UniProtKB/Swiss-Prot annotation:
Can form hexamers. Interacts with E2 protein; this interaction increases E1 DNA binding specificity. Interacts with host DNA polymerase subunit POLA2. Interacts with host single stranded DNA-binding protein RPA1. Interacts with host TOP1; this interaction stimulates the enzymatic activity of TOP1. Transmembrane segments: none annotated. InterPro entries: Helicase_SF3_DNA-vir, P-loop_NTPase, PPV_DNA_helicase_E1_C, PPV_DNA_helicase_E1_N, PPV_E1_DBD, PPV_E1_DBD_sf, Rep_E1_papillomaV, Znf_lg_T-Ag_D1_dom_sf. The keyword Zinc-finger does not apply. There is a cross-link at K558 (Glycyl lysine isopeptide (Lys-Gly) (interchain with G-Cter in SUMO)). Phosphorylated. Sumoylated. It catalyses: Couples ATP hydrolysis with the unwinding of duplex DNA by translocating in the 3'-5' direction; ATP + H2O = ADP + phosphate + H(+). GO terms for biological process: DNA replication. This is Replication protein E1.
C-alpha cells in the first residue's frame, strides 16, 4: 500500500470522495427517440419576436447597407486569399516573378525595408481594365502613383501583394485599409494581361510586337502574307500566345498524325507559353483550317494566333530555321523541307549556278515544247529539283529567255523535219504513239463511202511522194459525211498544219506551208476555189512557188502534200476545168454513222493510223530499207555542250 505520510484529514477537501446523484426517467430496455427532448413542453414562446416588425427608420437603412457592404468585402477578401493560396495561373509561369517571390518567401517585410527612397517610375499603361480578377500567380496592384505604406508597431509593410506568394500569418499585426471600390482597384495578373491585351482594337499589331519582343526578330521576316484565308499551302508558320503549360507537353504527339515535318519552339513569358512552329501538313490546307485545328489542340481562341506561310525564297528565313533546329530549344521531327535544304546545305549551295539557256532549249526539244506558254509553265515547275530552272525563276529576263527558247526549239524541229524523208517522218511520228491500234476501221469507213480501197491506196501513195499533178487530194460531198473528221485525223497523225481561207485577205496566209510536211485546207468555198484557180495552180502542181512571209523575205518552196475538204464537186463545174488534172477528187456521199450512244462507229484515231501505215507500208512504198532494219544508229540531237570522255 502507498505511504500516506503527510496526508491529513483523509477523505475530506478536494482530494476526498464526492457523491453523484443520477436521476433516471426511463427504465432499462425502453427505446430512446433520436428527436429533441420529448419532455420539453413546446409553448411557442421561443417564436415570439421571430419576425422583426419594428418600424424601419432612415438611419437603420444606411446602417444595414453599410453592414452588407462590409460583409461582402470581407467575403470577397477571404475568397481572394483562398485563390492566391490554392489556385495556380495557367497563363503565367512562376519564373516570371522569381525575384519578388524569393523576397516574399524569405520575409514578407524584407521588401519594405529601404535605406533610401526609391524614385518614382512613371509607367505608361497602354491597356487598362476596370475588372477585378485574380489568377493565383498574378499580382494585385492598386492603381496609385506610389505604394501606400502604413506603419504599425514600428514596422513598415508594403501595400502591394507579393505576387500571390506572401500571405498574412496569425498573430502578426495586420493592416486594414479602407475598402476601395472596383473603379479604384485593378488586378493586373497573368490572366488579365492576356485577356485585356487581346481585347484591344488592333490584336495583330499587339501580337506582332510581343513576338518581336520575345524572339528578337519580326514575324514578317519569316513569313510571306496570304491575303485570302482560302488560299491553300503545304507549309505554315504559326505563333500561338497564352498556351497552357500542360498542353505544351502533349502538343508534339497531338500534331504528329497531321504533319510530316514539325519544328516546334516554346518560350515562357508573362503571358504564359508562347509557341512558334513550322509545320508541313500531309495535305494542303488553308488558313481557316489550320486555325481551327490548332485552336482545338492548343485550347486557345483562333485570334490568339498568327498564321502565315513561310518565306521559301528567303535565305535569311531558311537559315533561321536551320540554325534553331540545331539547338536544344527546338523540337524537330520529320524530313527537312527542300526549300530549307536548298538554301542551307553545302551541296545544294554549290549546285546553284547561273542560268544556261542551252539547258532550257535542250529540255524543251526533248519534251516537244515549242509554245512559249507551255515552256514557261512547265519549266517553272522544275525549280524545286533543277538548279537551272531555279536560276531561271530568279532571273529578271524570264520573258526573253522563254521567247528565245521557243524560237530556237522551233528552228531545231524545222531543220530536223526538213532533213527527213516522208518515210522517215511517218516512222518518227509513229514512235510518239504507244498504243497499237487497228487499221480495219479506216478501211471500213472508206468502203462505207463507196471508195475502192486499192484505188485510194494508189492515189495516197502518189500524194505522199509529192508527185506533180498528184500533190492535192480533195474530199468532197454533202455535209455530215465525215470529210473533215477523216482529214483532220490524218493531218494530226502526220503532224501537219491547217490553213484557212478566212485569212486570205492577208499576204501571209500561206506562210505555214513553209514549215510543214503535209497541210489541210478545210471547207473550200467557191471563192476559195476561184482563188486557187487564179493564183495557186503552180502550188497544186507541186512545183516551186514563192511564199510571202511576215518580216522576212520571200521563200521559194515546193508545196507539201495538200488535203482539201469541200461541199463543192469541182468535177461538175465547168469554170474549174483547169483544176481537173491538178486535184484528185474522192466523193463521200454517205453520212457518218454513229451508234445509239452518240459514239462514232468507225474510230479514226492516231493509233489506228499508225497501224494503217505499218500494215500497208509496202503498198504505200514507205517500207524501211534493209539498212534501217537494225535500228537507228545515229546519236540523239544535243544542243548542250558535252564533256570529253578520255579513254584509258
Amino acid at each position: 500500500m502507498a505511504d500516506n505520510t503527510g496526508t491529513d484529514n483523509k477523505g475530506t477537501g478536494c482530494s476526498g470522495w464526492f457523491l453523484v446523484e443520477a436521476i433516471v426517467d426511463r427504465k432499462t430496455g425502453e427505446e430512446i427517440s433520436d428527436d429533441e427532448d420529448e419532455t420539453v413542453e413546446d409553448s411557442g414562446l421561443d417564436m415570439v419576436d421571430f419576425i422583426d416588425d419594428r418600424c424601419i427608420t432612415h438611419n437603420s437603412l444606411e446602417a444595414q447597407a453599410l453592414l452588407n457592404e462590409q460583409e461582402a468585402d470581407a467575403h470577397y477578401a477571404a475568397v481572394q486569399d483562398l485563390k492566391r493560396k490554392y489556385l495556380g495561373s495557367p497563363y503565367v509561369s512562376p519564373l516570371g516573378h522569381i525575384e519578388q517571390s524569393v523576397e516574399c518567401d524569405i520575409s514578407p517585410r524584407l521588401n519594405a525595408i529601404q535605406l533610401s527612397r526609391k524614385p518614382k517610375k512613371v509607367k505608361r499603361r497602354l491597356f487598362q481594365s476596370r475588372e477585378i480578377t485574380d489568377s493565383g500567380y498574378g499580382h494585385t496592384e492598386v492603381e496609385v502613383e506610389a505604394a501606400t505604406q502604413v506603419e504599425r508597431h514600428g514596422e513598415p509593410e508594403n501595400g502591394c501583394g507579393g505576387g500571390g506568394h506572401g500571405r498574412d500569418k496569425e498573430g502578426e499585426g495586420q493592416v486594414h485599409t479602407e475598402v476601395h471600390t472596383e473603379s479604384e482597384i485593378e488586378h493586373h495578373t497573368g490572366t488579365t494581361r492576356v485577356l485585356e491585351l487581346l481585347k484591344c482594337k488592333d490584336i495583330r499589331a499587339t501580337l506582332h510586337g510581343k513576338f518581336k519582343q520575345c524572339y528578337g526578330l519580326s514575324f514578317t521576316d519569316l513569313i510571306r502574307q496570304f491575303k485570302s484565308n482560302k488560299t491553300t499551302c503545304e507549309d505554315w508558320v504559326v505563333a500561338a500566345f497564352g498556351v497552357h503549360h500542360s498542353v505544351s507537353e502533349a502538343f508534339e504527339k497531338l500534331i504528329q498524325p497531321l504533319t510530316i515535318y514539325r519544328h516546334i519552339q516554346w518560350l515562357t513569358n508573362e503571358w504564359g507559353m508562347l509557341l512558334l512552329v513550322l509545320l508541313r501538313f500531309k495535305v494542303n490546307k488553308n488558313r481557316c483550317t489550320v486555325a481551327r485545328t490548332l485552336a482545338t489542340l492548343l485550347n486557345i481562341p483562333e485570334d490568339h494566333m498568327l498564321i502565315e506561310p513561310p518565306k521559301i525564297q528567303s535565305s535569311v528565313a531558311a537559315l533561321y530555321w536551320f540554325r534553331t533546329s540545331l539547338s536544344n530549344a527546338s523540337i524537330v521531327t520529320g524530313e527537312t523541307p527542300e526549300w530549307i535544304a536548298r538554301q542551307t546545305i553545302v551541296e545544294h549551295g554549290l549546285a546553284d549556278s547561273q542560268f544556261k539557256l542551252t539547258e532550257m532549249v535542250q529540255w524543251a526539244y526533248d519534251n516537244d515544247y515549242c509554245d512559249e506558254c507551255d515552256i514557261a509553265f512547265e519549266y517553272a515547275k522544275r525549280a524545286d529539283f533543277d538548279s537551272n530552272a531555279k536560276a531561271f525563276l530568279n532571273s529578271n529576263c524570264q520573258a526573253k529567255y522563254v521567247k528565245d527558247c521557243a524560237t530556237m526549239c522551233k528552228h531545231y524541229k524545222n531543220a530536223e523535219m526538213k532533213k527527213m524523208t516522208m518515210n522517215q517522218w511517218i516512222k518518227h511520228r509513229s514512235k510518239k504513239i504507244d498504243e497499237t491500234g487497228n487499221w480495219k476501221p479506216i478501211v471500213q469507213f472508206l468502203r462505207h463511202q463507196n471508195i475502192e480501197f486499192i484505188s485510194f491506196l494508189s492515189k495516197l501513195k502518189l500524194w505522199l511522194q509529192g508527185t506533180p499533178k498528184k500533190n492535192c487530194i480533195a474530199i468532197v460531198g454533202p455535209p455530215d459525211t465525215g470529210k473533215s473528221m477523216f482529214c483532220m485525223s490524218l493531218i494530226k497523225f502526220l503532224g501537219g498544219t491547217v490553213i484557212s481561207y478566212v485569212n486570205s485577205s492577208s499576204h501571209f496566209w500561206l506562210q505555214p506551208l513553209c514549215n510543214t510536211k503535209v497541210a489541210l485546207l478545210d471547207d473550200a468555198t467557191h471563192s476559195c476555189w476561184g482563188y486557187m484557180d487564179t493564183y495557186m495552180r503552180n502550188l497544186l502542181d507541186g512545183n516551186p512557188m514563192s511564199i510571202d512571209r511576215k518580216h522576212k523575205s520571200l521563200a521559194l518552196i515546193k508545196c507539201p502534200p495538200l488535203l482539201v475538204t469541200s461541199n463543192i464537186d469541182i468535177t461538175t463545174e465547168e469554170k474549174y476545168k483547169y483544176l481537173y488534172s491538178r486535184v484528185t477528187v474522192f466523193k463521200f456521199p454517205n453520212p457518218f454513222p454513229f451508234d445509239r450512244n452518240g459514239n462514232a462507229v468507225y474510230e479514226l484515231c492516231d493509233a489506228n493510223w499508225k497501224c494503217f501505215f505499218a500494215r500497208l507500208s509496202a503498198s504505200l512504198d514507205i517500207q524501211d530499207s534493209e539498212d534501217e532494219d537494225d535500228g537507228d544508229t545515229s546519236q540523239a540531237f544535243r544542243c548542250v555542250p558535252g564533256t570529253v570522255v578520255r579513254t584509258v
